[in-house]
């Protein structure tokens, strides 16, 4: 059976695994409970600035 000839470092191993995970996992979107706009989960809403029922982003008035 084939054996590795050189030890692979942890950083090199993790870089290889990160490429696989980046391609296979899709972004999870949910609707904001405050305004109803689609947002990424576990992130503040870009449209209204709310996260977990609190106002966290200061949106400048145009």
From Swiss-Prot:
Q: Which domain of life is it from?
A: Bacteria
Q: Name one GO cellular component term.
A: large ribosomal subunit
Pfam families reported in the protein's UniProt record: Ribosomal_L32p (PF01783)
A Gene Ontology biological process in which this protein takes part is:
translation
Recorded GO terms, molecular function? Answer: structural constituent of ribosome
Membrane-spanning ranges: none
InterPro entries to which the protein is assigned, alphabetical: Ribosomal_bL32, Ribosomal_bL32_bact, Ribosomal_zn-bd
User: What UniProt keywords are attached to this protein's entry?
Assistant: Ribonucleoprotein, Ribosomal protein
Q: Which family does it belong to?
A: Belongs to the bacterial ribosomal protein bL32 family.
Record's protein name = Large ribosomal subunit protein bL32
The record lists the lineage as:
Bacteria, Pseudomonadati, Chlorobiota, Chlorobiia, Chlorobiales
